[in-house]
């Protein structure tokens, strides 16, 4: 099965508890469709370059997912319907990167 990098921005008004619930809900959607969540990273509450839906900040999160293309299409369709997710980007990757991403490394410095 192919590997996908799924990055999304959640609303700034979500508490940490609500954000964890959103991530758990997304991961349960994946497992229902036969996909596997390999890695999850929280990048933090970051400023936007421009306002999105009258919001200036958002919670940036990234997931690495192993899934078939049909189940990934279904997952993306359901994420579009979720009002807590403002934007997302899904990319196909060749392999899982080692270590933390640059965003996590920058936030730890």
Swiss-Prot record:
One of its GO terms (molecular function) is structural constituent of ribosome. GO terms for biological process: translation. One of its GO terms (cellular component) is ribosome. CDD domains: bS6. Keywords: Ribonucleoprotein, Ribosomal protein, RNA-binding, rRNA-binding. It comes from the Bacteria. The keyword RNA-binding applies. Binds together with bS18 to 16S ribosomal RNA. Belongs to the bacterial ribosomal protein bS6 family. This is Small ribosomal subunit protein bS6. It comes from Ehrlichia ruminantium (strain Gardel).
């Amino acid at each position: 099965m192919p590997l996908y990098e799924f990055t999304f921005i959640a609303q700034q008004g979500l508490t940490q508890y609500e954000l964890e619930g959103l991530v758990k809900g997304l991961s349960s959607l994946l497992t229902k469709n036969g996909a596997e969540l390999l890695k999850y990273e929280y990048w933090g509450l970051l400023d936007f370059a421009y306002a999105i839906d009258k919001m200036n900040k958002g919670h940036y999160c990234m997931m690495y997912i192993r899934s078939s293309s049909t189940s990934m299409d279904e997952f993306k369709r359901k994420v579009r319907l979720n009002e807590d997710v403002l934007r997302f980007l899904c990319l196909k990757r060749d392999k899982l990167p080692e270590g933390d991403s640059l965003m996590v490394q920058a936030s730890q410095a």
